[in-house]
From Swiss-Prot:
Homodimer. This is Ribonuclease 3. Disulfide bonds: none annotated. CDD domains: DSRM_RNAse_III_family, RIBOc. Digests double-stranded RNA. Involved in the processing of primary rRNA transcript to yield the immediate precursors to the large and small rRNAs (23S and 16S). Processes some mRNAs, and tRNAs when they are encoded in the rRNA operon. Processes pre-crRNA and tracrRNA of type II CRISPR loci if present in the organism. Residues 5-127 form the RNase III domain.
Length: 229
C-alpha cells in the first residue's frame, strides 16, 4: 500500500507528512470505519475560496455574478472527476465490497468527492499555502482558458452548472398554468430546486421563456446572482 501511495503522491505533486490523512481522504463511506466525508466538507470550502480568490484577481472587471458562474464551472463535479481520472485516483480508493463491485471507483461523484477530501487533507497536513498551490497547479490550465464571455449562458444552463458543482439533483420544471388564446398564450412554470424550500416561478410567451425566468429566479434565491448581472 505504501509504494502504491508513493505513486499517487508523485502524480498529485505532493508528499504527505501524515500519510494517515491521505489514506482517510481516499476512504469512501462504504468502507468500514472512518471515511472521507469530513475532509470532503473541508476541501470543498477551501476549493471554493481558493478558486474564488484566483478569479477575483484574474478578472478585475468581472461582476459578482460572472465570478460566481466562472467558479461554478471550475469546481463542478465533472471537472474534479476529470482531474481524479488523470491522477488515477480511482485505483487508490478504499471502497466497500458492494461499491467496489458496482464500479464505484469510476463513479464521477465518488472521484470528485475524493479530490475535495485530498484538498482538505493537504490543508490539515501542511496548511493553506500548500492547498492553494496544489489547487492552482491542478486547475491552472482551465483557469487560464476562462474568459468572462464564458458566463454568457442562459439561466437554465447556469442553474444546472451551479447545482452540479454542489453535487445536487438537477432542477425540475413544471408547467402549472397556460392562459390566453392559442395565438397569444402565457405559460406559467414552477422550478423546484433541492437547495430551496420554496419553488420559484416564471411566466412568458413560451414554455422555454417561462422556464428561463423561473431558473433566473432560482439563481437569485440561491444567492448565486443578484438579479442585475
Amino acid at each position: 500500500m505504501s509504494n502504491s501511495l508513493d505513486r499517487l503522491e508523485r502524480k498529485l505533486g505532493y508528499t504527505f507528512k501524515d500519510r494517515d490523512l491521505m489514506v482517510l481522504a481516499l476512504t469512501h463511506r462504504s468502507y468500514a470505519g472512518r471515511n472521507n466525508e469530513r475532509l470532503e466538507f473541508l476541501g470543498d470550502a477551501i476549493l471554493n475560496f481558493v478558486i474564488g480568490e484566483a478569479l477575483f484577481h484574474h478578472f478585475p472587471q468581472a461582476r459578482e455574478g460572472q465570478l460566481s458562474r466562472l467558479r461554478a464551472r471550475l469546481v463542478k463535479g465533472e471537472t474534479l472527476a476529470l482531474l481524479a481520472r488523470g491522477f488515477e485516483v480511482g485505483d487508490y480508493l478504499r471502497l466497500g465490497s458492494g461499491e467496489l463491485k458496482s464500479g464505484g471507483f469510476r463513479r464521477e461523484s465518488i472521484l470528485a468527492d475524493a479530490m475535495e477530501a485530498l484538498i482538505g487533507a493537504i490543508y490539515l497536513d501542511t496548511g493553506m499555502d500548500s492547498a492553494r498551490e496544489r489547487i492552482i497547479a491542478w486547475l491552472g490550465p482551465q483557469l487560464r482558458e476562462l474568459t468572462p464571455v464564458d458566463t454568457n449562458k442562459d439561466p437554465k444552463t447556469r442553474l444546472q452548472e451551479f447545482l452540479q458543482s454542489r453535487g445536487c439533483d438537477l432542477p425540475r420544471y413544471e408547467v402549472v398554468d397556460i392562459q390566453g388564446e392559442p395565438h397569444c398564450r402565457t405559460f406559467f412554470v414552477d422550478c423546484e430546486v433541492a437547495l430551496l424550500s420554496d419553488k420559484t416561478h416564471g411566466h412568458g410567451g413560451s414554455r422555454r421563456i417561462a422556464e428561463q425566468v423561473a431558473a433566473a429566479a432560482a439563481l437569485v434565491a440561491l444567492g448565486v446572482e443578484n438579479g442585475h448581472d
